[in-house]
């Protein structure tokens, strides 16, 4: 067993897999595991695995022990991650409450919502708080200027600020794409499916407050789009892959329940609305507590529009009658069929196959849980990029260390890098330098005076 295979097995174990770890422990280089986990922003999650090993494999650890100095360093970092999570949770709850009190519906994207799916929500390395606000760009900018300290920069999809020392991004919309056709389709999809996301309220751990987070049905599309965007920007890391693994596992449980009589299609609408999952499945490929903390509550004053109940364009094509809709819900595969159609419509189908390959190779996702067939060729490329670049591409050594260069040099190195991807993803790769150039001049034009 080589190092990287052992690392992948250890990640699965840290997420709750019950496979035998004796052979993995025997060949594990603990210092290399620490370096890998640090590069991929997974130190907290991996330390959870080490603590579990101490309880389940004490004799094996005696034969290949973790050095005391390394263990203490790792433990200290994990405690720091826990404290960071507690602070970010508190600020996320405060920010959500403040926005709602000021009459702005919103939801927290990725981040602390994703952490709730982990076996230990405090083990995920936190980042900034991304909050999607249900208002026009003008209203959000006017509000932000009154409530926050802003820099002079503005981006197409968000404003950057901070609250109580925690970086915050106020989103006009969740994500963008480089290709203008797919970007327009994506924004239409966001608008059609927005309403339920702002009313899907969950509780943060230890009384930190309540926030709205997107539904699993929304996340399975949105977070894949986020991965796709960052793949062409500076790269993605294993932390984002694990986030998406948990989303896919949660989605599988949701659509398996889609034949439940309590789940129905609204009359006069083609949109299917699954209930948020509430309990673990016990499957070895997903932690049993995957969805346990997602305690849905009443989401405030807005009512859920029939056209915004979780997926856009959900009907089986050519048949929207109420009678046929009931027949559609009798199949547990309906939601998967719909999502696959959305992936193709939004230009995500090939990338979805690559991600499924990575989830299978690294985390053992079984074929029956996949949202698309594995694409081995594109998947191997994606996995190589993840392993080389680390968290958001911060550790790239190829492409001229492009993430560590100045703006001018990085501009051309990014183009050079993305030309490597043209034969795999031509629409997005060829559009990337055009979009980035346009975005630069757009930012200059809209820069705060």
Predicted regions and their residues:
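Conserved NTP-donor binding/palm subdomain of two-metal-ion nucleotidyltransferases/polymerases, i.e.
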Residues: 1-127, 132-257, 333-449
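Intrinsic disorder/low-complexity segments
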Residues: 257-334
């Amino acid at each position: 067993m080589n190092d990287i295979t052992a690392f992948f097995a250890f990640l699965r174990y840290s997420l709750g897999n019950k496979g035998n770890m004796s052979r993995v422990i025997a060949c594990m280089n603990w210092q290399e595991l620490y370096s890998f986990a640090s590069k991929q922003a997974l130190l907290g999650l991996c330390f959870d695995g080490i603590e579990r090993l101490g309880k389940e494999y004490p004799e094996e650890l005696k034969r290949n022990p973790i050095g005391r100095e390394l263990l203490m360093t790792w433990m200290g970092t994990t405690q720091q991650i826990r404290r960071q999570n507690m602070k970010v949770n508190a600020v996320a709850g405060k920010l959500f409450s403040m926005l709602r009190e000021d009459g702005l519906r919103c939801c927290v994207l990725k981040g602390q919502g994703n952490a709730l799916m982990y076996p230990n929500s405090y083990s995920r390395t936190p980042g900034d708080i991304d909050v999607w606000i249900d208002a026009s760009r003008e209203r959000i900018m006017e509000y932000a200027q009154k409530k926050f300290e802003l820099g002079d920069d503005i981006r197409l999809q968000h404003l950057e600020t901070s609250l109580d020392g925690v970086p915050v991004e106020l989103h006009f919309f969740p994500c963008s794409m480089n290709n203008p056709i797919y970007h327009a389709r994506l924004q239409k999809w966001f608008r059609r499916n927005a309403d339920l996301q702002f009313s899907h309220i969950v509780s943060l751990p230890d009384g930190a407050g309540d926030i709205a987070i997107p539904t699993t049905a929304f996340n399975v599309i949105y977070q894949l789009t986020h991965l796709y965007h960052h793949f062409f920007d500076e790269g993605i890391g294993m932390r984002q892959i694990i986030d998406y693994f948990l989303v896919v596992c949660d989605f599988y449980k949701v659509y398996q329940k889609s034949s439940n009589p309590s789940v129905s299609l609204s009359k006069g609408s083609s949109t299917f609305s699954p209930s948020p999952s509430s309990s673990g499945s016990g499957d070895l490929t997903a932690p049993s507590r995957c969805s346990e903390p997602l305690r849905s509550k009443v989401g405030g004053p807005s009512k859920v529009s029939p056209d915004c109940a979780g997926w856009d364009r959900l009907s089986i094509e050519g048949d929207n009658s109420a009678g046929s809709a009931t027949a559609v819900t009798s199949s547990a595969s309906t939601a998967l069929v719909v999502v696959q159609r959305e992936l193709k419509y939004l230009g995500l189908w090939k990338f979805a196959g690559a991600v499924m390959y990575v989830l299978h190779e690294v985390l053992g996702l079984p074929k029956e849980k996949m949202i698309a067939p594995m694409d081995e060729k594109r998947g191997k490329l994606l996995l190589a990029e993840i392993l080389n670049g680390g968290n958001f591409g911060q550790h790239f050594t190829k492409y001229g260390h492009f993430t560590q260069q100045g703006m001018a040099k990085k501009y051309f190195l990014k183009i050079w890098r993305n030309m490597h991807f043209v034969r795999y993803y031509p629409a997005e790769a060829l559009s990337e330098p055009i979009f980035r150039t346009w975005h630069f001049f757009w930012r200059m034009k809209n820069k705060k005076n």
